[in-house]
Amino acid sequence: MGTVPDPLRSAKTSLIAASGKEDDLGEPQAASPRHRPALLCKNANGFSGAPAEPDLSPRAAAEALMQVCEHETTQPDMSSPGVFNEVQKAPATFNSPGNPQLPGSSQPAASAPSSAAGRDLIHTPLTMPANQHTCQSIPGDQPNAITSSMPEDSLMRSQRTSNREQPEKPSCPVGGVLSSSKDQVSCEFPSPETIQGTVQTPVTAARVVSHSSSPVGGPEGERQGAICDSEMRSCKPLTRESGCSENKQPSVTASGPQGTTSVTPQPTPLTSEPSACPPGPEKVPLPAQRQMSRFKEASTMTNQAESEIKEVPSRAWQDAEVQAVASVESRSVSTSPSILTAFLKESRAPEHFEQEQLRVICHSSGSHTLELSDSTLAPQESSQCPGIMPQVHIQAAAAESTAFQRENKLASLPGGVLKTSSINLVSSNAQHTCKEDGRLAGMTPVREESTAKKLAGTNSSSLKATAIDQISISACSQAETSYGLGKFETRPSEFAEKTTNGHKTDPDCKLSDSCGSISKADHSGSLDPTNKGDAREKKPASPQVVKEKESTGTDTSDAKTLLLNPKSQESGGTESAANPTPSPIRKNQESTLEENRQTKTATSLSLPSDPMGDSSPGSGKKTPSRSVKASPRRPSRVSEFLKEQKLNVTAAAAQVGLTPGDKKKQLGADSKLQLKQSKRVRDVVWDEQGMTWEVYGASLDAESLGIAIQNHLQRQIREHEKLIKTQNSQTRRSISSDTSSNKKLRGRQHSVFQSMLQNFRRPNCCVRPAPSSVLD
């Protein structure tokens, strides 16, 4: 057991990667041997990990899977009887527990075919899985239609054809991988289930184990096929739930690894699979649509909870490392108020404008935020730059970051997108759409709109479901969104909405995110060029969406340079405003996001200030925006201090710095007046509270009044300190004199007493002996 998971995992990873490539290449056969171990690994993981099926012993499952994996890896044809024997042993263990799962007739049928086969290998347990496998392979087709008697070659061919067909089906991303390998199918079948996390995984694993066993006799095979059909029917809802009905079908072929004996049953499922595959794709889209409907429902639910979800992504943005990064200028400005004066005029107007944009961005990102800030950022970023994307996604979610890495690769390679989508059930639609987008960047907006609607549902749903399936679903939807470059644009209506909300707003969101969450360099750096390139490439798709993306690309590029031209931002903001999502919702989202950001003191200052700065053409303006926000607070503080009569010299200086340029001219006169007024104020009689109404109500500049008050307070403090010092010195002197006199007196008293004792004459008995006598 200990050794089984590691090789399986390694094989799984390599096989999964290979399977994705093979699926994209349309070479499932070559990939099949690789995928088989991967699927087996998944099965082993599913068995051991699937608590739902206590009947299956994890050890037996792992051992069988290991054996099958070894057999598959060593023998893609699965002809070696030794391997079959090993597999039979493991499946035997599985079958005993797994039999309750399998139809009762499947075991006798399996045993009968094994006896009929009369092969050295004991396939009884394997035949059990073979029946199940045939059931799986025949979602719509009856397994009995294909008999195990079919020659291995024809079966293999049918398997290949079915496998080829399956990879073509985008709805079978997992299935594609599964179908790529004849034997893989059984292994992979559980793998999609394992991905789905349904109990089916162990069941399918047991079935696969039984399926991989000996070929079923023609009539027995038919019986088993019928049983399997019932099983598949029962499993179909699960597969549909998992959204991988096709994947399960390909998984049926997994029996191949068990050997030619199992291959015969495999061809049965496989041959049935080719026939089943054509309906399978139809069925697959149905489950995908169902999933989409589920996701849409989930999305509606998430939309209902948008405010909460938006808050979470906004928090994530605020938590992003980018927030921690503060431009030196902003810090210097915050520390030195004199610098603020130059920026105040420029930055204040941009603040309102940028705040609106940020709100729009926040809103769009918020609406997209339902999917997650990652999803909004992911579509652009994932499509734009895989390297940067993982970082941003890592901030949001590690799983999503991995998915985004894949998506980034996919964004660069439509095949890659298909791979990731193949992994995801939703990705089946994403694959089609991605393929269409990759092949036809300028596909008619209607098509892509329909696909965009599906993908939009899948994206929002998958992104919303990202918490559970972040890697798989988010990879699909985000791969879609990353292809969303084409898809979003080609989907002018919905993805124009989502892209405007999510993608286009993503540029805005990138501004807000760059301001608040994801590293601006990441957004602008990798995402911007990709956005620009993607937008340019996909301009034919839909000029409106392309324009939006271009604006987003320009915005992101501006964010990159931190020189966001107000024009580009305005265009982005206007476009985002033009986005189908209602402005009131955005406003609500913006308000919520802004509130969330503002609630966070330091981060809120930096975050809103960043978006503010972003709208301003210069990166330096970002710092002014922050400083500007800080500056208004300072004046409020100064006013409070003035009211409280507790002005600090720094506060007064800050006020002077905060005063607009017009006041600078007055500063000279003010300083003179301050001197005069301060002199006058000093002469004023101060009441208990520190100042009389004459002084408090006098028409004095804040600076002069503050200075006068400070001078008065300082004088009082000095006087008080002098008094304290004098008192302390007096008390110390008295204490020192007392202590010294006491010590002296005590010493004297002691010495007098001792002298009296010494001088007192004692009787001879009590006379102190001489010291020498003691020594003697």
Curated annotation (Swiss-Prot):
Phosphoserine: residues carrying this PTM: 332, 365
InterPro entries (alphabetical): GPRIN2-like/GPRIN3, GRIN_C
GO biological process, one term: neuron projection development
Comp. bias intervals (Polar residues): 129-161, 193-203, 242-274, 566-580, 725-742
Pfam name, any one: GRIN_C
UniProt key word Iron-sulfur: no
Skewed-composition ranges (Basic and acidic residues): 520-552
Superkingdom of source: Eukaryota
Region feature Disordered, mapped onto this chain: 1-37, 68-312, 518-637, 723-748
Low complexity biased stretches: 101-118, 208-217, 604-620
Keywords from the named record: Phosphoprotein
GO cellular component: plasma membrane; synapse
PANTHER family documented for this protein: G PROTEIN-REGULATED INDUCER OF NEURITE OUTGROWTH 3 (PTHR15718:SF6), G PROTEIN-REGULATED INDUCER OF NEURITE OUTGROWTH C-TERMINAL DOMAIN-CONTAINING PROTEIN (PTHR15718)
Biological role: May be involved in neurite outgrowth.
Protein name stated in the entry: G protein-regulated inducer of neurite outgrowth 3
Name of the coding gene: GPRIN3
